[in-house]
Amino acid sequence: RWLEPVPTLPNVERDARGNSNLRLSLDKTGLHVFVINFDGICSLADEIRLSFPQLGVSGGVDFAERLLNIYSPAPLGARFADGKTSFSLFAPRAAYASVEWTLDGVRRETSASSCDGAIWTASADGDLSGARYFWRIGGKNRDATTAFSSSEPVADPYANAMLSPDGPSIVKFDADLPRARPFKPPHWHDLAVMEIHLRDVLAKARADISDGERLTFEGLTKWLADENCYLRKVGVNCVELQPVQEFTAAKRTDYEWGYMPVNWFSPASSYATDPENSSQNEDFARLVEAFHRAGIAVILDVVYNHVGEPNYLVRADKEYYFELNMAGDLMNFSGCGNDFRSESPMARRMILDSLKKLVKNYGVDGFRFDLAELVGLETLREIEREMKTLKHDIILIAEPWSFRGHIAAALRDTGFASWNDGFREFMLSYALGRGDFAGFKYFVGGSRDTSRFCAQTVNYLESHDDKCLLD
């Protein structure tokens, strides 16, 4: 869009095509700083370029500061009201967007519009529950900070259910999700936690469950009801489930740890008994309830420091959702290909909204945050405030490091516990005869240099990443 200057200004000049330009002369001001104001609101999808021929300089205006501070409380995802199904998506620099949806074998496309230039909304008559849908997002890729591609289907980041990691999203309204029953987890200082992978614990479980059920939430629910289930006998009062939010998987039956999330609102379709009908929501809720009936609290291992493939958020806005270097390339302190920009207001909102849903709709008792150093202290503190308002006895645990740094000491004055890698390394040395009693006393006494109280340190010898007595 060409910004037409006021024609009566003394420094207006016209180019060969008759376009009006404002000539800014260093000879007039003696300064190398110019302040340029214009009326109205410029969309972030617009391009504004400044040219200084005398200096041989030209370039686009950088809106990064404005971009990275955009926030909207508007509803996102699919919702039903007043006889219409509406779809809303945050894409602040998109030039156009549409929703492709299919119901009862009939495919349609609905164009979206944006009132504020950030939230795009498309509506269709009727209740579209069960419809499959994708977004199409388009815009001009002026530099490496965007990755728009209208040919690439984009699953809804706020979809409550996915048919598979590759999509499509499934229309499932919040009103149709389960509602959790109250459960009081053990106090932090009484926690005995076992980390488990759903398919690992079911692979050799002695229970009357089929091979297919051994891959699902439902299979673990059935095993928990069996009197021979060792999870009920081993002495733990809490399990930490490795990731169960929708994650990258080539095939539904593939064994994956789950640390490459593609959607934080949909329980994993790979673990559903009937993903075609989005059973994962009810399947997962029943599993949490089964653990609670057995007196066992449920912590989820959650990954908010990076995303997997397909990377849908990079199509919505690469710079808004991801940390970039000066060349516009994705940063990679996670070691997983990208670092999620959690301090962007709508990115942080997405984290909080998904955590709240896991507590309110599924009854989850706590969270272990993968590579929490990348999530950032400010976001972690906001998570603590919001989660403890929602559930005062929520369990919050950080893996307090990344390839960038370590924040265990910085978490000392928060309500987070931290995985203690110092204890892990010391116990290996101790077992090999290289440790001493003073060191043992320090770690068993709560590692008070980084912890305010003993229960704030999570001492462990083995995890999915660390078999330190063998490594």
Name every feature range the model reports, one short phrase each.
Residues 1-43, 101-104:
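Immunoglobulin-like IPT/TIG beta-sandwich domains and homologous Ig-like subdomains
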Residues 26-84, 107-109, 114-195, 201-212, ...:
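The feature marks proteins involved in alpha-glucan
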Residues 90-96:
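Short proline/glycine-enriched turn/loop motifs at strand-loop junctions of beta-rich domains
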Residues 97-99, 133:
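Short beta-strand elements bearing conserved aromatic residues within extracellular beta-rich modules
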Residues 159-170, 384-471:
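Conserved alpha/beta catalytic core and glycan-binding cleft of carbohydrate-active enzymes
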Residues 184-188, 197-362, 372, 379-387, ...:
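Substrate-binding/active-site clefts of carbohydrate-active enzymes
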